[in-house]
Amino acid sequence: MKKALIVIDVQAGMYTAGMPVHNGEKFLEILQELIGECRSNDIPVIYVQHNGPKDHPLEKGTDGWKIHKAIAPLEGDCVVEKTTPDSFHKTDLKEVLQDKGIDHVIISGMQTQYCVDTTTRRAFSEGYKVTLVSDAHSTFDTEVLRAEDIVKHHNVVFGAFADVITLKDLKETVSK
């Protein structure tokens, strides 16, 4: 199986939106390590970037819209722009994956209960083998749930659609 890493919506505006990202700095460190591991195993990294409406923290073209500098794309990396929680809906993600011969996606990013959830389910429905890195997705606290609980809950639910593994476990199997 040919793999690709998808990094969803880890944009500067997520870190300036007025709410702290759950395990924010550690999350970025994990993503850096995950991206590095994939690059060293010739696994392409595909960034998904949300285009928010005017005055939104992720408004297209603003500083908040940019991919977070800690994990910024390198020259030649693919960036797919989207306007909905589904990274496949009205984007060229499926075509990018097909052009690269990808049949196994590794998913990471933000926000767990929105874009990571929707993209994980859609990738499964599109027929991809899906791996979700359980410590490489995050979100914010909400009015009803703490971010930590959202992440834990989704790591259980995602098991119906994906292999849910830690970065440590992924590193042991990524080259296979």
Question: Across the structure, where does each feature detected by a protein language model lie?
Answer:
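Short, glycine-rich nucleotide/cofactor-binding loops
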Residues: 18-24, 108-111
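Short acidic, Gly/Ser-rich segments with clustered Asp/Glu that frequently serve as metal-coordination loops
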Residues: 13-17
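A short alpha/beta connector and helix-capping loop motif
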Residues: 20-49
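Glycine-rich, proline-tolerant flexible connector loops at the mouths of alpha/beta enzymes
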Residues: 18, 52-56
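Active-site-adjacent betaalpha module
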Residues: 3-4, 32-36, 41, 58-176
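Short coil-to-beta-strand
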Residues: 1-10
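Short, well-ordered beta-to-alpha junction loops that form the rim of enzyme active sites
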Residues: 50-51, 110
